[in-house]
Amino acid sequence: VISLRRLFALATAAAAASLAPALALADPAPAAGTLLTDPGLTPQLKILALLTLLSLLPAVVLTMTSFTRVVVVLGFVRHGIGTQQSPPTQVIVGLALFLSAFTMAPVTTAIARDAWEPYSAGRITAEQAVAAATTPLRSFMLRQTRESDLALFYEAARQPLPQTEEEVPLRIAAPAFVVSELTTAFQMGVMVLLPFLVIDLVVSALLMSMGMMMVPPSTLSLPIKLLLFVVADGWHLLVGSLLRSFA
């Protein structure tokens, strides 16, 4: 089970790392981690720096974790079955968050071990903690990123391709990762929608052959699709496929 402290460490590290290029181009100023630990700053400024990092949490969850793939595939399932509001959007998002937390467990564990705990104990600086936290997060994203998507952003940035993954900055790894996640999610969505599409076509053909053209096909196809999904243990197969896709 992933603790809230580990999730907070992941979000803080990713947010600080994503801000690093912009901070480097700006006028010399304390880094995000330094703002939280500088004894010369007032508590109000420290709270402001912390709230700034927390405001980036939704962007971190959407662009640097497995959440995007999971929530898109779950949305395709609901659309394919034809139940517009069941399961509710809140349930889909909640399930996607918990599945994302489960798949990101090795990353958060590595961040807590290599970055958060040493930094909390005062053994490393804030900059060293950000660098240590970035390594497992970047490694996870690059494992799920297609080379063509990564090359696309390097070409757009007019930079040579890196030789090692340590040379890939998060400002390039994150968008390439999101594009790859959307591609994978749509591929899985096609496989999910095909059986439901076949049922819709068969039901429509049967209704037309029986002269019942005024009967909406969804009236008969919805119970059949629900029955098929339940008999096939659809949620078990779906969640298992999603988890294995990140292995």
Question: What is the predicted role of each segment?
Answer:
Residues 6, 23-247:
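Hydrophobic alpha-helical segments and their helix-loop boundaries in membrane
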Residues 1-27:
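N-terminal secretory/membrane targeting signals
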